């Protein structure tokens, strides 16, 4: 199962990885932590992840997200907020 808080993220995953297109995006029950899901075999998603890793070409993840026209600017703000929280843990 692949879960997301933002439906658009799963739509982009399906756009970029045709093997996921035959799997329907479903909305989970109210109150669940991740609202959106795709039920996909583990082996299929493992191939998707391997392709994603092989295709990494950016030097800065947050910067690449900020430059993407496909992502909501609020997502990039959330990435920076999470980064700031974890930065405080660094010693």
Regions found by a protein language model. Give the residues of each.
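Structured alpha/beta or helical-core interaction and ligand-binding surfaces enriched in interleaved
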Residues: 1-91
């Amino acid at each position: 199962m692949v879960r997301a808080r933002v439906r658009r993220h799963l739509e982009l995953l399906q756009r970029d990885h045709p093997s996921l297109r035959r799997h329907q995006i479903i909305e989970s029950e109210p109150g669940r932590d991740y609202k959106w899901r795709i039920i996909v075999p583990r082996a299929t998603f493992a191939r998707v992840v391997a392709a994603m890793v092989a295709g990494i070409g950016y030097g800065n993840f947050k910067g690449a997200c900020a430059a993407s026209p496909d992502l909501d600017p609020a997502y990039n703000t959330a990435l920076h907020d999470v980064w700031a929280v974890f930065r405080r843990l660094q010693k």
